[in-house]
């Protein structure tokens, strides 16, 4: 069972450094890390880091241009992947050690096309005004919209594709399930309020 960890990145240097190092340390030997870079937005420091990893065979790197269509972008990432299953992770997310070390076993024991992954969203600097403005739910731990399950694990087959320009979703799978709704299986997704506001404003332009 080979897993392809598929990552899209544009300018998240510090975040992707944590992510790639973590995946490299904990993944199976046969697994691969595929990185699709939005080249026009990349800093020289990010380019240099990605090229070092590519030269060391830590990652498979493709440089391209994001044209405002998220499904097309993720489908381009899918084409890079040669694993039996693809785990799609944003550059500013981080899976747990339990997830990376056990997901292949989970997939081997379950003939499933797509699996939803819970996500722990936190925003540093979040105020009550922001929560009301965006209609978010925040629990006692400061997690936003928990469990915020995401379509992030899918069989690598031509029939399963991403659709929609914004708020992209997977289409073409026949069977689906959820990982346990627990922190140990969830992707961590920390942001600052400045980054959140910038991202929300960007989505409004698409």
Predicted regions and their residues:
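N-proximal low-complexity "stem/linker" segments adjacent to membrane-targeting elements
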Residues: 1-25
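Histidine-centered beta-alpha loop that forms part of the nucleotide-sugar donor binding/catalytic region
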Residues: 10, 38, 119
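A short acidic, amphipathic alpha-helical/loop segment
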Residues: 18-22, 49, 76, 101-103
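Acidic donor-binding segment of Leloir-type glycosyltransferases
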Residues: 20-63
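Solvent-exposed polar/charged
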Residues: 25, 79-80
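Short, acidic/glycine-rich phosphate-metal binding loop used to engage nucleotide
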Residues: 62-70
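Catalytic-site signature of metal-activated, phosphate-bearing donor transferases
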Residues: 70-78, 85, 94-206
């Amino acid at each position: 069972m080979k897993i392809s960890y598929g990552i899209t990145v544009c300018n998240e240097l510090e975040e992707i450094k944590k992510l790639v190092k973590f995946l490299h340390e904990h993944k199976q030997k046969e697994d691969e890390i595929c990185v699709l870079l939005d080249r026009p937005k990349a800093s020289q420091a990010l380019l240099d880091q990605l090229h070092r990893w590519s030269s060391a065979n830590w990652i498979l790197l493709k440089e391209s241009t994001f044209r405002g269509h998220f499904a097309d972008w993720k489908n381009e990432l899918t084409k890079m992947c040669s694993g039996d299953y693809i785990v799609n992770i944003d550059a500013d997310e981080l899976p747990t050690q339990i997830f990376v070390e056990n997901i292949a076993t989970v997939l081997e024991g379950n003939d499933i096309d797509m699996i939803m992954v819970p996500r722990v969203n936190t925003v540093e600097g979040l105020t009550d005004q922001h929560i009301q403005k965006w209609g978010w739910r925040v629990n006692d731990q400061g997690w936003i919209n928990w469990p915020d399950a995401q379509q992030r694990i899918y069989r690598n087959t031509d029939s399963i594709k991403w659709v929609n320009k914004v708020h992209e979703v997977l289409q073409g799978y026949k069977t689906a399930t959820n990982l346990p709704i627990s922190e140990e299986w969830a992707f961590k997704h920390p942001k600052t309020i400045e980054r959140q506001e910038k991202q929300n404003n960007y989505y409004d332009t698409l």
